[in-house]
């Protein structure tokens, strides 16, 4: 392997005595590039190529979900937020055979929660936005059946946050402080969540909104606009997206791949 060793001068402190010791630490071998732009790994010449990956942003898709017991089809319309770094959030409008239309969301790929619980957790409850959900349901009347059932479930923002926490971390005792911290860290903390400038531009274009490109975390208005488009699609208004279209893909360059490796090294 054509490489060079990496050594780091490290300083260690004894927590009990306060003694400080400095020494050189071997961190590993770093592959070296040849003058032809290739690498030699275990005697084999290799090259790093760019990757075609899903672009960050929001994607609206139709679909069908099957229940394994009776293989009955559930008609779906989904709106999924794909960040550059962080947890996905998937919202859906579902039509079960012979039952009311329901809208829900999966936060951090956990169990499905009611869409009304998510909206209340974002601050669209009676205390912060009086009458908002009633007006929302009047506009999308096919959700009236679900609204009548969910009206009294986690009716405040605090109770909605606790409900999401219990779904995401079953078995752990929920407190309002930990529930708020978890919800914020998932989508509204720049250290854990990054939509990227490209993702923000694509989301602005898809949602027909104007938000600064440097706003790389989610806003509650983003989620609300996604919900509105998703239920519009269920009502027959608007167009779905083609996930395989090249407009929904991007090139991950060699420089970005190396950047991610350096970031991993820094975190160590």
Residue ranges and their predicted role:
Residues 1-265:
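N-terminal non-catalytic structural scaffold regions of very large proteins
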């Amino acid at each position: 392997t054509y490489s060079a060793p990496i050594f780091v001068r490290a300083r260690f402190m004894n927590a009990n005595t306060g003694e400080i010791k400095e020494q050189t630490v071997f961190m590993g071998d770093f592959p070296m590039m040849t003058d032809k732009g290739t690498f030699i790994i275990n005697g084999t010449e290799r090259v790093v190529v760019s990757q075609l990956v899903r672009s960050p942003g929001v994607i609206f898709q139709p679909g069908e979900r099957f229940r394994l017991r009776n293989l009955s089809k559930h008609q779906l319309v989904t709106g999924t937020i794909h960040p550059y770094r962080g947890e996905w959030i998937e919202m859906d409008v579902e039509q079960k055979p012979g039952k009311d239309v329901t809208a829900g969301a999966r936060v951090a790929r956990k169990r499905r929660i009611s869409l009304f619980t998510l909206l209340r957790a974002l601050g669209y409850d009676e205390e912060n936005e009086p009458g908002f959900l009633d007006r929302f349901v009047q506009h999308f009347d096919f959700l009236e059946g679900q609204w009548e059932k969910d009206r009294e479930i986690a009716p405040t923002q605090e109770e909605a946050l606790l409900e999401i926490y219990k779904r995401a971390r079953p078995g752990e005792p929920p407190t309002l402080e930990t529930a708020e911290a978890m919800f914020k860290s998932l989508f509204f903390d720049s250290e854990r969540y990054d939509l990227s400038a490209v993702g923000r531009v694509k989301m602005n274009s898809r949602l027909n909104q104007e938000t600064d490109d440097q706003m790389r975390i989610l806003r509650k208005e983003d989620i609300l606009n996604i919900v509105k488009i998703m239920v519009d699609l269920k009502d027959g208004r608007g167009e779905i997206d083609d996930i395989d279209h090249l407009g929904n893909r991007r090139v991950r360059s060699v420089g970005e791949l190396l950047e991610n490796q350096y970031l991993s090294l820094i975190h160590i």
